[in-house]
């Protein structure tokens, strides 16, 4: 059974992970499947070392896992439940602030979508 302290610790780790826009961008990218740090860096327009630092934080928070393939490391969300939970969390946040359309909806409509973060 989860104690209050365990729940608080889990929420604090999640909050730490989501507090940084770059980590949020990495999590969103990983919703599409496993990636190598170099792929994430190229996709997000960041340096590989920056991405690696953020991936280290996300691993420490328990949100991503690393799989070693020789000298390369690929990253994925830690659990399929996490992918669903992140999707639900986004929907809840958007439901609270209805003036902020979903990025995917804006992109589908042809509206320019700017992704920020470093």
From Swiss-Prot:
One of its GO terms (biological process) is response to lead ion. Cd(2+) binds at residues 57, 61, 102. One of its GO terms (molecular function) is cadmium ion binding. It comes from the Bacteria. Keywords: Cadmium, DNA-binding, Metal-binding, Transcription, Transcription regulation. Residues 3-97 form the HTH arsR-type domain. SMART domains: HTH_ARSR (SM00418). Changing residue 24 to S: Loss of repressor activity. CDD domains: HTH_ARSR. SUPFAM superfamilies: Winged helix' DNA-binding domain (SSF46785). Metal-responsive transcriptional repressor for the cmt operon. Binding of cadmium or lead causes the repressor to dissociate from the DNA. Homodimer. This is HTH-type transcriptional regulator CmtR. It comes from Mycobacterium tuberculosis (strain ATCC 25618 / H37Rv). The lineage of its organism: Bacteria, Bacillati, Actinomycetota, Actinomycetes, Mycobacteriales. The gene is cmtR.
């Amino acid at each position: 059974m989860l104690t209050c302290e365990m729940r608080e610790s889990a929420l604090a780790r999640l909050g730490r992970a989501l507090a940084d826009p770059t980590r949020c961008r990495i999590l969103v990218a990983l919703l599409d499947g496993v990636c190598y740090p170099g792929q994430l860096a190229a996709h997000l327009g960041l340096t590989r070392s920056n991405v690696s630092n953020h991936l280290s934080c996300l691993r420490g928070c328990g949100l991503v896992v690393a799989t070693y393939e020789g000298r390369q490391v690929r990253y994925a969300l830690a659990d399929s439940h996490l992918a669903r939970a992140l999707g639900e969390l986004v929907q809840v946040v958007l439901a609270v602030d209805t003036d902020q359309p979903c990025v995917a909806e804006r992109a589908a409509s042809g509206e320019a979508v700017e992704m920020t973060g470093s």
